[in-house]
Amino acid sequence: MAGTGTIRDSVQLSLGTHRINPQPGPMTVHVDSYRFLDIVTRQMVKAWIAKEPSRDIPWAELQKPVRDCSVAVISSGAVALKSDTPFDQETERKNPWWSDPTHRVIPRDARGEDVEFYQLHIDASFAREDLNCLLPLALLAGLEEGGEIGRLAAHHYSFMGYTLDPTFLIEETTPKIIEGLRNDEVDLVLLVPT
């Protein structure tokens, strides 16, 4: 079933200034998602969003209860096993408009001491204290143990967010992640943006 919104609607909802009126009446909550951005960055982001083509958001109804689903995580936090190839920070330092468009596979039993964080656009100190901030594997394992989810998938995925040119990410990385999710028979994916 196709979604009724568009990607542009979604981006504008998540980044734009909008009003929320949860109940009829005089109380209105104003949400300004740009409030922490300087004026130049704010204008740049708004111009970038305006240039994005409007596309339908694909939507798939869940076919079974969550308690019967296999669940995986995809994080844009650039999380990688210490034993794996690091994300390319050096090229990004030289060209801040570029980010490594590849991905890393993280096993379900990974712990904080097993991984490193390569995202240059966030303070990863909180994730070093608690991996669940960027890759909530322990939390999901607890839900699995409690019968809230069917099972935690064997493999999870991370890529480096802030990808201004998503061509490689869409054409090369995403199909590989989808193949891995299908191989693990994943029913539900938790997307963890940074």
Which residues are covered by each model-predicted region?
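An N-terminal assembly and electron-transfer interface module characteristic of large anaerobic redox
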Residues: G5-R8, L13-T194
